[in-house]
Amino acid sequence: MNTRLVNKLKTSATCVALASGMMLATAAVADQVTLKSADGTVNLVGDFVEFKDDNYVIRTALGDLRISASRVRCEGAACPQLNDVTADVQIAGSDTIGLGMMPLLMSGFAATLDADAELVNTAAGQTIATLVSDGGFGDEIGSYLVSATSDDDAFAALLGGSAKVGMSSRRITKDEARALRAEGAGNMVSPDQEHIVAIDSMVVITHPSNNVGELSVEQLRGIFSGQITNWQQVGGPNRDINVIAHDNQSSSYDFFMNYLYGEERPNFVPQGIATDDQTASNVVYQDRGAIGYVGFAFQRGAQPVTVVNECGIASKPDAFSAKTEEYALNRRMYLYNRADNLDEASLNFINFAISEAADGVIGKSGFIDLGILRRPQGEDDDRAISLRKEAAAYDAGFEAGVVREMLDEMSDNDRLSTTFRFRTGSAKLDERGRLDLARLVDYLENAPQGTKVTFVGFTDSVGTFEANRRLSLGRAGSVLDEVRSVAGDRVAQIEFAAAGFGEVAPSACNETDGGKAINRRVEVWISSDSAA
């Protein structure tokens, strides 16, 4: 282990505590506990003294510190066993959502009710939000207990009936859905029971002075397995690479390593292990040789790295690519509920979490909301450059003509981040598409008279070129029909059209099922001279 980097990790964590007016203790004894806040700004270590008046008291080198239980959770064998907490609604599952998003979501939800959310951490990973009317001066109108542990626990709690809402940073598995259905929970992947609330992007970061702004998946595999050890090996300076990883029990570690290696993970000890994204970002920012990975909100002053997949397609870590789900290291954040025990309080919270009203607090939490962004498609656009190369590779004929047709259309249209996806050979939208339809109609309702919106279809590479073009046009037409059906007269001022370009302009490799799923899509283009 690199001693210098380990010291940097400790120093970074100390700086975070100092920013909150606190100090980390260095003692390690049997009664030691750690007090952590959900946002990572407080991380205190000391000997447990007592729990009194909803405050933890710990002893550090600076003396006794008193910390409100509403600000932190307690970890360690010496933490007090608090009484079981009862609440109107129990929410359980992913610590990524429970600790990173739920506190602000609860506050935002309360605000829509003209209430205040009083948050108290009752135990490690457990928070109760009590909603009080009249901005906190009235009566209690509801309480929500959030237990943040793991994705698996979301479905176990729903199955056992101990939770009304489950949180997960992955989609429910077929076995989990079948088990719940057998217990009377209903169809767990129906629109009424499966809800996408946000996108989380993992971003590879380096020191801001590092001139390596792009790395291939193969190069990342080499770096995070210890086979590539010097930046010079990937076009950078002659400097040792210091890998900053997450603890192997964290969901961030699991997601990142699964993307690079699947189940066959290397036996490699990194130069530093960060306890959270904030620490990882701070360490990478201070070390010219460091590389790490953090959530989208924690890039800060570090340099984000563009990831190039096995097919040579570059994926930039920006909000637009994340919303289109064309960035390589994306995952959806889900809420789930049973059909047989959903009450009004649970439903009201879920409806808020998936609404546009929640976008602001989701963004503040460090996740990427599902709001719509708009991007020009000029001739200097990365995709336009790639398409010109693709056209040159075809013999003059049908395929080359399709590529040129797409380039002509791009020059007159901007692209919206709303992107609809389909199953293989199907015109049926996936689970996110249903939510995006409603948001798109809301967005287009404000477009000026004469705006032209084109639904542009694409496919994977399964099948012939001509058949895929017909399929892509059919999918684009089906989305257009869905939008008209949902919108009614609300978008009467818009001229709609459909186009299909088949398998050209892939966003991912067609060699994998995941890549094919990304490529089966319908994009939304809007005339450049309009301003929605």
Which residues fall in each region the model found?
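Short, surface-exposed beta-strand segments enriched in small/polar/acidic residues
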Residues: 93, 415-425, 437-476, 496-508
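Extracellular interaction modules
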Residues: 9, 61, 520
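Gram-negative bacterial Sec-dependent N-terminal signal peptides
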Residues: 2-28
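Structural motif
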Residues: 332, 450-452, 519-521
